[in-house]
Amino acid sequence: MRSLMLLAVLTLCALPAAATDWVQAPGSSLVFAGSYQGEIFNGHFPGFQTRLRFDPANPSAGRLEVDIPMTGVTSGNPDYDEEMRGPAFFDIKRDARARYIAEGFRALEDGRYAADGRLELRGNSQPVTLTFTWQEGEHPTLAGRATVERLAFGIGDGMWADTSMIPAQIAISTRVVFRPAP
């Protein structure tokens, strides 16, 4: 009997920790940085929502879902904002949402992780890797960065496809504060 109890305890200790489900809490941000004819500008995507399943001890079981309403994209420059929402860029009348989904993360060095996912934007789906750090606590925080190849999504077509005017790569950064999922 004692052997069975010891075996049961050892078996439970050997099981991997269960991943925790998280939802986005207030204080989160999703921003981008680009440039137009050498002038740097930043923008953000208000209203995005994030769900995460994550256990730092078992990153391969991770899952990240981000829903991004494109209608509110803003750079603080009304002219840029109008153009970004139009057909040459995000074309919000045709597709008002973007979505990023990653399953199975990789542990990197220095406490970083990589989420190899797919971004669905403007009817296109392309691979995008988000590298991130994870800060434990009552409200854990994910801080991450990614690079998006805008032309692969048809962002900035026509005269805007000229990469001397707007670079092909757009830097994305995020800071997501989480709370346990209900």
Predicted regions: what they are:
Residues 1-4:
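Positively charged n-region of N-terminal signal peptides that target proteins for export
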Residues 19-182:
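Low-complexity, acidic/polar, glycine-enriched regions of mature
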